Every structure is written in C-alpha cells, then in structure tokens.
C-alpha cells in the first residue's frame, strides 16, 4: 500500500470511529479539515463556490462569490481565467455549462449593496446565456428563476422554478442568438399533497425523463423525483426531521449527491456530503466529514460526466447557503479502494476477535 492510500485508509478508519452511532459524533477542535485532507481529496482553489464540471472533466466553472464574477479553472495546470470580466454586470448567483459548452448564468440586472439578497430572489434573478468563446456579453432568455436551474448534460434543455412551479424549455439559436422554445409547466406546487419550497436540481440520466428536485421544509427537506411525462412524484430520501438536499447526480442516474445532516440532525449549518441511492431504498453513504471539525461544513457537490470525480466546496459554519471558501476535488475511485481496504481490515479484526473469544470459552 502506498503512502497516499495508507493515509486515506487510516483517515476513513478514524472518522468511522468518530461516527459509529447517531448522536455520538466527536468534535475536532483547533484544526481545519483542510489540514488533514486524505489522499483522495485535493484542494483546487483557495476561493470560490458552486463548482460545475466541463463535459470533458478538464475544467471547473465556479463563482468567486455570491453576486460575483464567474471563473474557470483548468485542473491539469491550475490556471484560473475570468469568464465575465469582459463586460460590466451586477454579479451572478449561478453558472452552469450547457450541453454545447456555452454557459447558463443566473443574475439580476441591478444590485444594491444595501439590500443584496433581493438580487437572489425570483423577482430579480434572470437567466442568461454566455457564449463559450466569450465574444460578447450574455443574452437574456426572458425568464426569471428561483435559485438554481436544472441543466441537461446531453441536450440544450433547462428547467427552472418560478412562483412555486417548474418550467422546462429548450434553448435554440436564431441568427446566433439564444432563446427559449417549447416552454411548458411541468409541475405546479399547489397540486402536491404536501407544502414545500421547491427547487429544480438535475435531469436524471441516462434518459433524462425524470427531474430531481428539492422539497424544502417538508419533513425537514426531502429529495424528490418528478416523472416529466406523467407528473408522478417520488420521495427518494424518506427521512423525516432530516435535511436532505440533492446536488450533483451520477452519470448512470443510480445515485445523487446530497447535502445532509444525518450524522447529527442539527440543520444546514452542520451538513456534509452523502451519496443517496435513487432505487427507492433511501440508502445513504457519507462521503465527507468536514462537519466533524468545529466550525466547518462541506457543500454543493457535483460529479464529473465520467463519474470518476466529485467537486465540492469547503464552507464555514454560519455561511449563507451556497457560500464557499474554495473548491476541492474528491477522487471517487481512490476513495472506494481505501474504503474496501478499511472494510477488509475491519472484517479481519472481527474474525480475530471471534477466534480469541472462542479460545477463551
């Protein structure tokens, strides 16, 4: 076993001991999780939030801050380039790659430093398309959006929330200018048998016939799926009094990443990243342990198109939802290897204990 693999396995074992049972998580004080990163996690930037992988997995798009500029980091070289410095604007709250490589932005036309959060509301945040060649300013699509839109990774299709309802449309180009076509309402929150704040998250691969979304303040917060054609809604997290917010989805559609407080149930300021099965079992697996460190949390994860890597952000307790303090890369394959080694060692230890107990009978 090489040093990095050994370090990863040791950390998994240590963190597992810290979280053996609900309600007994030990708090690590006086140190940052960034000081004790396992071999399968690497810090990419020292600022920024809301990462999004390019389709080839070589670059990550991110915001400098809420209502800030958009940047892109090249993972191989670490080179960061600005994407929105070539024109004046009022700042953005979302930036996502479209299927053709252009960028979908969400941001208001006006920003007031004395009332900043108004620019994030659905009354003011608009959707725009910025061409990948950065040949000019973005073009407004004529729609306002509550929080984050869902963007297809395969088609020029988006879904968004407005007025407690979900809408879907295709982005088409006429004379080189993007616009929406075929807009239709796919869900009205008033038709649901429960009350919740709604937000679109992802089209579920591989066929993208289902939309994964958040149901805020329903039984805590639940991960839901909407069959786009039939309108059927499924609860995938099924965890009352627990916070489960869907984030990045795996390319095979079998799992989604979630921000979750299952380990302590203290709410959004104590979240970490989990992997949730979308087979109806509500099975979860914890991937990060940043909230074990006093004052920290991990959030806003996304998955690369090949399913190999996860990008996420570090944040501090007290930060507003979505705020990040740097982007990190999580090697999912390396993690799985380290986890298997840990499980193998645990099994060997259990077998040895059993043999010793038998000998003492």
Where are the language model's segments positioned?
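Bacterial N-terminal signal peptides
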Residues: 10-19
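Sequence signature of WD/YWTD-type beta-propeller architectures
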Residues: 24-361
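Bacterial N-terminal signal peptides that target proteins for export
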Residues: 1-10
């Amino acid at each position: 076993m090489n040093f990095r693999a050994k370090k990863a396995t040791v950390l998994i074992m240590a963190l597992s001991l810290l979280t053996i049972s609900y309600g007994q998580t030990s708090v690590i004080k006086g140190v940052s999780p960034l000081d004790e990163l396992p071999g399968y996690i690497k810090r990419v930037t020292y600022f920024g939030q809301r990462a999004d992988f390019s389709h080839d997995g070589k670059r990550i798009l991110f915001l400098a801050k809420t209502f800030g500029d958009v940047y892109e980091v090249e993972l191989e070289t670490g080179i960061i380039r600005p994407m929105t410095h070539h024109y004046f604007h009022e700042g953005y709250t979302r930036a996502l790659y479209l299927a053709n490589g252009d960028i979908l932005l969400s941001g208001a036309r006006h920003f007031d430093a004395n009332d900043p959060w108004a620019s994030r509301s659905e009354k003011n945040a608009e959707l725009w398309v910025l061409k990948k060649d950065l040949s000019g300013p973005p073009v407004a699509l004529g729609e306002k959006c509550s929080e984050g839109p869902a963007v297809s990774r395969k088609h020029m299709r988006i879904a968004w929330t407005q007025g407690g309802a979900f809408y879907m449309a295709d982005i088409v180009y006429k004379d080189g200018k993007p616009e929406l076509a075929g807009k239709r309402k796919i869900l009205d929150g008033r038709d649901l048998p429960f009350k919740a704040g709604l937000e679109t998250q992802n089209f579920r691969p591989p066929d993208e016939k289902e939309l994964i979304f958040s149901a805020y303040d329903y039984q805590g917060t639940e991960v839901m799926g909407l069959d786009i054609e039939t309108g059927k809604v499924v609860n995938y997290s099924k965890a009352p009094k627990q916070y489960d917010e869907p984030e990045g989805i795996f390319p095979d559609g079998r799992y989604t990443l979630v921000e979750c407080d299952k380990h302590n149930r203290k709410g959004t300021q104590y979240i970490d990243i989990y992997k949730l099965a979308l087979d109806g079992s509500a099975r979860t697996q914890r991937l990060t342990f940043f909230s074990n460190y006093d004052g920290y949390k991990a959030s806003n994860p996304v998955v690369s198109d090949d399913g190999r890597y996860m990008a996420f952000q570090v944040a501090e307790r007290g930060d507003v939802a979505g705020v990040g303090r740097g982007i990190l890369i999580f090697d999912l394959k390396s993690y799985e290897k380290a986890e298997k080694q840990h499980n193998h060692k645990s099994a060997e230890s259990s077998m040895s204990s059993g043999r010793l107990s038998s000998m003492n009978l």
